[in-house]
C-alpha cells in the first residue's frame, strides 16, 4: 500500500486533492447529486477521457440519476494516449504524416509514432515512464519526493521550505538561493539519485538548482509544528518565461496543462506560486489565462519571505524551455502535423475562459489581418491589401491591432477564435493560431527568414499554414537595422505584391471551404 502511495503519480491513480472528493452518506439524499460535476469545467469532448482516468467518478455517475455525463459512460475506452492501458485506436487523435523524413526514420508509421512522442501525449507518457522516487516515506503521512529525469518535473508531499535567511537580488533564477536544510522533508533521501539528475541544470530547463539541496530532515515538518505557514491546497511551482511575449508565455501555459495531465488533475482549487528569486514583480499581458488553471491570484515566492512554509502537496511544473521540450525547444520530424495535445490545450483554455464559436457563417469566410503598431515588420501597403480582399464578396474582412491597453486578451481571443483565415507578419502575435477553429488557415505574410517557428506551431496545433513564396514579389523598406547585428530582415517593414497576396489568400480560403469540419458543403465558384 505504501509503495502505491509513493508511485501514485507513476501509476496515474492518485490525483491531486481538490478535484475528486469522495461524497459522504449525507450526500446520498434524494434530489442531491452525489458528485459536484460542475467542478470539472471540461469541454464535453474531454469528459470520457477524464472518466477513463477517474473510474471512481464514473462509478458514482453510473449510480447517480443527476449525473449529466451518462452518455459518456459508453466511451470509457477513450484515453489520452499516455495511459498504460490505452489502445492506439482510442487515443485523443493521432498525428497525420504526408511523407517520410528520411533523416529521422523510414516509414510513415514510425514517423507518426515519433511525432506523437516528440510533441503529443506520447511526450507525457515518456515523462511518466521516467518518474522515480528521490525521497522515500516510511509511512503514509511522511514527506516524499518523486521526479522525472533531469528533475524536469517533480511532485512532493510534506515539503518544508525555510525562507528566513534567503538573499534576493536582480537574478530571477538564482541557483544558490537555497542552502542545505532550507528545503526538504521527513523521508529517506536517495542522495545519489538526486545528484545524478543535474546534467541539464538551467533556469528554465530543470528544477535541479532549486532541489539539489533537498535535505532529509529529522523532524516531521507539519506534524511537529515546525512551520509558520501550512499551505493546505495543492500548489504548483512554476518558473515563468517572458510574460510580455505571447509565444514564450504560452510555453508556460502549455507545460502547465501538460503537468495537469501528468498529475491527472484539472482542478482550479489550487495555488500557483511563481518561483522567482529576484525582488522584481512580473509583467504579464496575458494574466486572464490563469483563470483556466486556478481560482486564485498567482503568488510570488517572495510572499513567503522570512517564513518557514510547509506545503502538503506541491508540484514542480514542467518548464518552458526544456531541452527537447514543448514548444520552444522542440525538434520536430518534418512531414507530420496535428497533435491531440495542442488541440486539447486550445479547447481546454477556450472552454474555461468562456470563449465561444459564433460561426462559421454560410457564404462567408471571416478574414482577420493582424496589424502592427511596432516600429518594425509593418505592412506598408496594408490598405491596398485590405481593399483587394474586400473585392471578394465572400470575405468578411477585419483589421485588428492586439494592443493590450486597447483590447483585452479575452477580447483578442474572441476575435481569433471567430476567424477563418488569420493573416499577420512574423511575430509573437501569430501565437494566436493556437486558438483558431480547426478548419482555419494561418497566413504568415512574411516569415523574415525564420522559417520554422510558426510553421511548426501550426503543425503542432493542426492548423493549415501558408507563407509568402516568391521573394521577387515582397519589397522590404531597407535591409533592416538590428541594434547590434546590423542588417536583419526582422528589423524593417515590407510591401507586398497585391496579385500574389490575393492568390495565396484564395488558396487559404479554398482549404477552409474544403475542410471536413466546414459545415456548408456547396460550390464556391465566387472565389
Curated annotation (Swiss-Prot):
Which BP terms in the Gene Ontology apply to this protein? protein O-linked glycosylation
InterPro entries per UniProt = Glyco_transf_61_cat (IPR049625), Glycosyltransferase_61 (IPR007657)
Positions annotated as glycosylated: 354
EC number of the protein: 2.4.1.255
Chief subcellular location equals: endoplasmic reticulum
Does this UniProt record's set of keywords contain Glycosyltransferase? yes
Q: Where is this motif: Prevents secretion from ER?
A: 524-527
Looking at the keywords, is Phosphoprotein present? no
What tissues harbor this protein?
Widely expressed. Expressed in brain, heart, kidney, lung, skeletal muscles and thymus. Highest expression is observed in lung and the lowest in skeletal muscles.
- Pfam family of the protein (one): Glyco_transf_61
Q: Where is the short sequence motif Required for optimal activity located?
A: 295-297
N-terminal signal peptide:
1-19
Q: What's the catalysed reaction?
A: L-seryl-[protein] + UDP-N-acetyl-alpha-D-glucosamine = 3-O-(N-acetyl-beta-D-glucosaminyl)-L-seryl-[protein] + UDP + H(+); L-threonyl-[protein] + UDP-N-acetyl-alpha-D-glucosamine = 3-O-(N-acetyl-beta-D-glucosaminyl)-L-threonyl-[protein] + UDP + H(+)
Q: Where in the cell is it found?
A: Endoplasmic reticulum lumen
A molecular function annotated in GO for this UniProt entry is: protein O-acetylglucosaminyltransferase activity
**Superkingdom of the source species:** Eukaryota
Keywords noted in UniProt: Endoplasmic reticulum, Glycoprotein, Glycosyltransferase, Signal, Transferase
**Gene Ontology CC entries for this record:** endoplasmic reticulum lumen
Q: Which family does it belong to?
A: Belongs to the glycosyltransferase 61 family.
PANTHER family found in the cross-reference section: EGF DOMAIN-SPECIFIC O-LINKED N-ACETYLGLUCOSAMINE TRANSFERASE, GLYCOSYLTRANSFERASE
Query: What functional role does this protein have?
Result: Catalyzes the transfer of a single N-acetylglucosamine from UDP-GlcNAc to a serine or threonine residue in extracellular proteins resulting in their modification with a beta-linked N-acetylglucosamine (O-GlcNAc). Specifically glycosylates the Thr residue located between the fifth and sixth conserved cysteines of folded EGF-like domains.
Protein known as: EGF domain-specific O-linked N-acetylglucosamine transferase
Q: Could you tell me which species this protein originates from?
A: Mus musculus (Mouse)
- This protein's gene is called Eogt
Amino acid at each position: 500500500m505504501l509503495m502505491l502511495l509513493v508511485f501514485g503519480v507513476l501509476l496515474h491513480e492518485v490525483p491531486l486533492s481538490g478535484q475528486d472528493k469522495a461524497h459522504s452518506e449525507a450526500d446520498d439524499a434524494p434530489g442531491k447529486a452525489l458528485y459536484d460535476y460542475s467542478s470539472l469545467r471540461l469541454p464535453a469532448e474531454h469528459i470520457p477521457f477524464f472518466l477513463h482516468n477517474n473510474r471512481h467518478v464514473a462509478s458514482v455517475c453510473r449510480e447517480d440519476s443527476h449525473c449529466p455525463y451518462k452518455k459518456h459512460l459508453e466511451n470509457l475506452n477513450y484515453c489520452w494516449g499516455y495511459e498504460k492501458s490505452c489502445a492506439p485506436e482510442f487515443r485523443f487523435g493521432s498525428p497525420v504524416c504526408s511523407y517520410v523524413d528520411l533523416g529521422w526514420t523510414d516509414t510513415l508509421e514510425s514517423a507518426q509514432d515519433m511525432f506523437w512522442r516528440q510533441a503529443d501525449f506520447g511526450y507525457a507518457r515518456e515523462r511518466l515512464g521516467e518518474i522515480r522516487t528521490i525521497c522515500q516515506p516510511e509511512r503514509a503521512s511522511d514527506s516524499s519526493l518523486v521526479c522525472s529525469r533531469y528533475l524536469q518535473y517533480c511532485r512532493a508531499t510534506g515539503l518544508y521550505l525555510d525562507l528566513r535567511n534567503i538573499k534576493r537580488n536582480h537574478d530571477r533564477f538564482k541557483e544558490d538561493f537555497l542552502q542545505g536544510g532550507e528545503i526538504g522533508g521527513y523521508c529517506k533521501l536517495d542522495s545519489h539519485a538526486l545528484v545524478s539528475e543535474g546534467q541539464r541544470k538551467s533556469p528554465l530547463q530543470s528544477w535541479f538548482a532549486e532541489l539539489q539541496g533537498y535535505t532529509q530532515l529529522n523532524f516531521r515538518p507539519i506534524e511537529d509544528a515546525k512551520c509558520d505557514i501550512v499551505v493546505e491546497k495543492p500548489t504548483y511551482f512554476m518558473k515563468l518565461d517572458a510574460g510580455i511575449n505571447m509565444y514564450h508565455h504560452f510555453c508556460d501555459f502549455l507545460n502547465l496543462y501538460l503537468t495537469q495531465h501528468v498529475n491527472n488533475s484539472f482542478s482550479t482549487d489550487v495555488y500557483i506560486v511563481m518561483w522567482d528569486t529576484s525582488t522584481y514583480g512580473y509583467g504579464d499581458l496575458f494574466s486572464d489565462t490563469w483563470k483556466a488553471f486556478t481560482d486564485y491570484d498567482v503568488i510570488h515566492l517572495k510572499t513567503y519571505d522570512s517564513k518557514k512554509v510547509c506545503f502538503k502537496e506541491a508540484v514542480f511544473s514542467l518548464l518552458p524551455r526544456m531541452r527537447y521540450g514543448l514548444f520552444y525547444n522542440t525538434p520536430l520530424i518534418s512531414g507530420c502535423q496535428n497533435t491531440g495535445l495542442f488541440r486539447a490545450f486550445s479547447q481546454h483554455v477556450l472552454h474555461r475562459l468562456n470563449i465561444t464559436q459564433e460561426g462559421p457563417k454560410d457564404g462567408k469566410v471571416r478574414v482577420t489581418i493582424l496589424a502592427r503598431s511596432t516600429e518594425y515588420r509593418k505592412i506598408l501597403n496594408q490598405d491596398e491589401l485590405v481593399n483587394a480582399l474586400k473585392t471578394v464578396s465572400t470575405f468578411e474582412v477585419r483589421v485588428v491591432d492586439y494592443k493590450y491597453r486597447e483590447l483585452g486578451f479575452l477580447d483578442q481571443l474572441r476575435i481569433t477564435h471567430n476567424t477563418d483565415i488569420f493573416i499577420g507578419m512574423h511575430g509573437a502575435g501569430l501565437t494566436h493560431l493556437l486558438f483558431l477553429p480547426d478548419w482555419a488557415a494561418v497566413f504568415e505574410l512574411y516569415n523574415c527568414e525564420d522559417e520554422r517557428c510558426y510553421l511548426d506551431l501550426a503543425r503542432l496545433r493542426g492548423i493549415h499554414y501558408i507563407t509568402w513564396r516568391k521573394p521577387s514579389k515582397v519589397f522590404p523598406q531597407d535591409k533592416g537595422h538590428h541594434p547590434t547585428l546590423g542588417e536583419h530582415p526582422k528589423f524593417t517593414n515590407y510591401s507586398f505584391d497585391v496579385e500574389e497576396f490575393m492568390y495565396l489568400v484564395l488558396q487559404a480560403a479554398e482549404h477552409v471551404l474544403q475542410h471536413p469540419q466546414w459545415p456548408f458543403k456547396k460550390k464556391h465558384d465566387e472565389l
